[in-house]
Swiss-Prot record:
Binding residue positions for a divalent metal cation: D8, D9, S39, N92
Keywords: Cytoplasm, Hydrolase, Metal-binding, Nucleotide-binding
GO cellular component, one term: cytoplasm
Function: Nucleotidase with a broad substrate specificity as it can dephosphorylate various ribo- and deoxyribonucleoside 5'-monophosphates and ribonucleoside 3'-monophosphates with highest affinity to 3'-AMP. Also hydrolyzes polyphosphate (exopolyphosphatase activity) with the preference for short-chain-length substrates (P20-25). Might be involved in the regulation of dNTP and NTP pools, and in the turnover of 3'-mononucleotides produced by numerous intracellular RNases (T1, T2, and F) during the degradation of various RNAs.
Protein name: 5'/3'-nucleotidase SurE
Cofactor binding mode and count: Binds 1 divalent metal cation per subunit.
Lineage summary: Bacteria, Pseudomonadati, Pseudomonadota, Gammaproteobacteria, Enterobacterales
SUPFAM superfamilies named in the record: SurE-like
Keyword Hydrolase included in the entry's annotation: yes
Chief place where the protein resides: cytoplasm
Domain of life according to the entry: Bacteria
């Protein structure tokens, strides 16, 4: 199995380093990751400037000022030959649950892999300690995929409780929960009297029902949520069409 491995925490982050070491025990792994933390970069792509890379002695490649999406795009189309069999993103330091997936560079890297036609996995740890647990779960999933490919055309967003492996209760297939909208902005003043702004923490959980990713991780289970790239709200087509007719917009042209 040939794996393109990326993340959004940066190439030196403990999550990606722990996972790369574990994956190399049974797979051919090429790391292509940002040279610094790009958390929250979502699906952003660098278009107004060139991208430089640096290759370490072990073959890992850092993309200078690159986003997670840049890294996967370059990895698939230029840096990994032959091309990968699968794109893996993580292990993220902290969860990507519910609405987090909208902003997550970890999920975005996997989404870019899927957009380019490859199976893709995004892996996050609900904490900052037991990266070895998340690595073991990821390896088990990838070994399963090598035995029997999952033909859903979906991204798997995996969130792992920050627990020793022996304390993991199992795996649940979940849906994304949701949070209350975040609204906290933290102003600060710099030495010259200018106001600086920090974006505050995410909102509290709003929908954390028993079938959500929030509930699974809180209860000690690995959450596996299938995600897809198509953002079309197919069920709303008729509603929107009827609305356009009712307000007279749909008949103007």
């Amino acid at each position: 199995m040939r794996i393109l491995l990326s993340n959004d925490d940066g190439i030196h982050a403990p999550g990606i380093q722990t996972l790369a070491k574990a994956l190399r025990e049974f797979a051919d792994v090429q790391v292509v990751a940002p040279d610094r933390n790009r958390s929250g970069a979502s699906n952003s792509l660098t278009l107004e400037s060139s991208l430089r890379t640096f290759t370490f002695d072990n073959g890992d490649i850092a993309v200078q000022m690159g986003t997670p999406t840049d890294c996967v795009y370059l990895g698939v189309n230029a840096l990994m030959r032959p091309r990968p069999d699968i794109v893996v993103s993580g292990i993220n330091a902290g969860p990507n649950l519910g609405d987090d997936v909208i902003y997550s560079g970890t999920v975005a890297a996997a989404m870019e892999g899927r957009h380019l036609g490859f199976p893709a996995l995004a892996v996050s740890l609900n904490g900052y300690q037991h990266y070895d647990t998340a690595a073991a779960v990821t390896c088990a999933l990838l070994r399963g995929l090598s035995r029997e490919p999952l033909r859903t055309g979906r991204i798997l967003n995996v969130n792992v409780p920050d627990l020793p492996l022996a304390q993991i209760k199992g795996i649940r297939v979940t849906r994304c929960g949701s949070r209350h909208p975040a609204d906290k902005v933290i102003p600060q003043e710099d030495p010259r009297g200018n106001t600086l702004y920090w974006i505050g923490p995410p909102g509290d959980k709003y929908d954390a029902g028993p079938d959500t990713d929030f509930a699974a991780v809180d209860e000690g289970y690995v959450s596996v949520t299938p995600l897809h790239v198509d953002l079309t709200a197919h069920s709303a087509h008729d509603v929107v069409s009827d609305w356009l007719d009712s307000v007279g917009v749909g008949t103007q042209w």
